[in-house]
Amino acid sequence: SLSGELFRAVAENTILREKLMGVYPKKPDRDRLLAGCTCAAERGVNEALFKVRIRQKFCTDTSEQLFSFLLGAVLCADVERLRRDGRGRRILVGGSDPLRFAYAFLLRECAGLAAEEIPEAISEYAAAYGAEQIALALEKRKNG
């Protein structure tokens, strides 16, 4: 998905950049990830983004806590979709932290899925491996 790009666009190109520009913790705050995802699921992503702004202006949240809440809110739609469509499937989460950690954590905690994190060194090759597997399956189908 484009959630990582959406997150960066919001964090760096909106009024939220005041406390989020350049913030990129290796491991997000788990409680704030859950709170952001829950807020977006219950009230929508726009209200969750507004809540980040309110907390930025009137609360003592750290930049890392705001980052985590925002990340949870932005990833919520992907988590909800996989909750509906991912039952019974093996879910491997690649990429780099903090997104990899956040996705896997939210899939386990919010969606009840057994998501596994792929080490960054391995996930670098996951797209090529996946493309190869698709090509092999298509070739097999074509040849009967």
Protein language model regions, located:
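Glycine-rich phosphate-binding loops at beta-strand->alpha-helix junctions
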Residues: G88-L106
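Glycine-rich phosphate-binding/hydrolytic loop that grips phosphoryl groups
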Residues: F7, A11, I15, A73, ...
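Structural alpha-beta junctions
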Residues: R108-I118
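Adenine-nucleotide phosphate-binding core of ATP-dependent small-molecule kinases
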Residues: T38-R81
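Glycine-rich phosphate-binding loop plus the immediately following alpha-helix
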Residues: S1-C39
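Short, surface-exposed connector motifs at secondary-structure boundaries
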Residues: R83-R90, L113
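Generic structural signal for well-ordered, non-membrane alpha-helical segments
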Residues: S3, E42, E64, S68-G72, ...
